[in-house]
From Swiss-Prot:
Result of knocking out the encoding gene: Deletion mutant does not show any difference in intracellular survival and oxidative stress responses.
One term under GO cellular component: plasma membrane
Keyword terms, alphabetized: Secreted, Virulence
InterPro entries cross-referenced by the UniProt entry: ESAT-6-like_Myco, ESAT-6-like_sf, T7SS_ESAT-6-like
Superkingdom in the source lineage: Bacteria
Keyword check for Secreted: yes
Phylogenetic placement of the source organism: Bacteria, Bacillati, Actinomycetota, Actinomycetes, Mycobacteriales
Organism this protein belongs to: Mycobacterium tuberculosis (strain ATCC 25618 / H37Rv)
Keyword Secreted included in the entry's annotation: yes
Localization per Swiss-Prot or TrEMBL: Secreted
Gene3D superfamilies registered for this protein in UniProt: ESAT-6-like (1.10.287.1060)
TM region(s), chain numbering: none
Name this protein carries in UniProt: ESAT-6-like protein EsxO
UniProt function note: Plays an important role in mycobacterial pathogenesis in the context of innate immunity. Aids host cell invasion and intracellular bacillary persistence. Increases host oxidative stress response, leading to genomic instability and decrease in macrophage viability. Also induces autophagy and modulates the immune function of macrophages.
Family affiliation: Belongs to the WXG100 family. ESAT-6 subfamily.
């Protein structure tokens, strides 16, 4: 009986998570542009309220990016570790 694991799929999933984390920067910039375009709501684009919102938004996106990137790295590492273990166990049974 042969069991086939798709370790490449695990690595690809981790890479996809990391790529999506990278795409967050474009979304962040788009939101900042929208906030600045609606600057009147905040009392002007240069107002303290507007700048504080943009600063907090940046912090939130940074946390999300860091966590998603770290999770993607962990998924890739887990896939790599499983592949290495599977290879080592498989070769010991040969």
């Amino acid at each position: 009986m042969t069991i086939n694991y798709q370790f490449g799929d695990v690595d690809a999933h981790g890479a996809m998570i990391r790529a999506q984390a990278g795409l967050l920067e474009a979304e962040h910039q788009a939101i900042v542009r929208d906030v600045l375009a609606a600057g009147d709501f905040w009392g002007g684009a240069g107002s303290v309220a507007c700048q504080e919102f943009i600063t907090q938004l940046g912090r939130n996106f940074q946390v999300i990016y860091e966590q998603a990137n770290a999770h993607g790295q962990k998924v890739q590492a887990a896939g790599n570790n499983m592949a290495q273990t599977d290879s080592a166990v498989g070769s010991s049974w040969a």
